[in-house]
A protein has these predicted regions:
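A short, aliphatic-rich alpha-helical micro-motif
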Residues: 2-3
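Cysteine-nucleophile active-site neighborhood
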Residues: 7, 13-86
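Glycine-rich His-Gly loop
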Residues: 12-15, 48, 112, 160-162
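Amide-donor transfer/coupling interface in amidating biosynthetic enzymes
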Residues: 37, 71-180
């Protein structure tokens, strides 16, 4: 199915377990993994689609295997206010294609789980299964720093919703479309 497409978007609001079950139901897990591994076409994950690319996730006392394309585990955020819903600033590295022309902007989030990092420095030292460096963008909500976006070769993903994030989100989507 995915061999005939120019690009793939895994969107969503919802639970990681449900999203992975739906992808398994259409025999899409291996296809997406191979697409990312080969790096021949741009792939974008949004919200739960972002979470799907990591190794594993725990939500509602259930541990689920993700696609395993990126190192990291999705966990419930340890903050007093959940879900994290609303606008927040993201902190991308200076040289990411995804954030070209975007600086100091706020994006719209709605989630309760994330890939939580100990420090922004450790988040920037990862390598994806496709062999490319993982360029991470971080955000802090109520003292909890988490990975809010990733660029790893042709794989890009955002915990936030660019489609709900006004002009900055539109620019981010234009940047991704330019990769096609």
């Amino acid at each position: 199915v995915f061999s005939a497409v120019d690009a793939v978007v895994l969107p969503g609001v919802g639970a990681l377990g449900t999203a992975m079950a739906n992808l398994r139901r259409i025999n899409g897990v291996q296809q997406v993994q191979e697409l990312v591994q080969r790096g021949e076409r741009p792939v974008l994950g949004i919200c739960v689609g972002h979470q799907m690319f990591f190794e594993q996730g725990t939500e509602r006392d259930e541990t689920v295997d993700g696609l395993g394309c990126l190192p990291g585990t999705v966990v419930p955020m340890a903050t007093p206010r959940l879900p994290h819903m609303g606008w927040n600033t993201v902190h991308p590295p200076a040289d990411t294609a995804l954030f070209t022309g975007i600086s100091g902007e706020r994006f719209y989030f709605v989630h309760s789980c994330a890939v939580v990092t100990v420090s922004p420095e450790s988040a920037h030292a990862m390598t994806g299964r496709n062999g490319h460096p993982v360029r991470t963008t971080t955000t802090c909500h109520d003292g909890c720093t988490f990975v809010s976006a990733v660029e790893c070769g042709q794989l890009c993903s955002t915990q936030f919703h660019p489609e709900k994030s006004g002009p900055a989100g539109i620019q981010l989507l234009r940047n991704w479309l330019a990769m096609i």
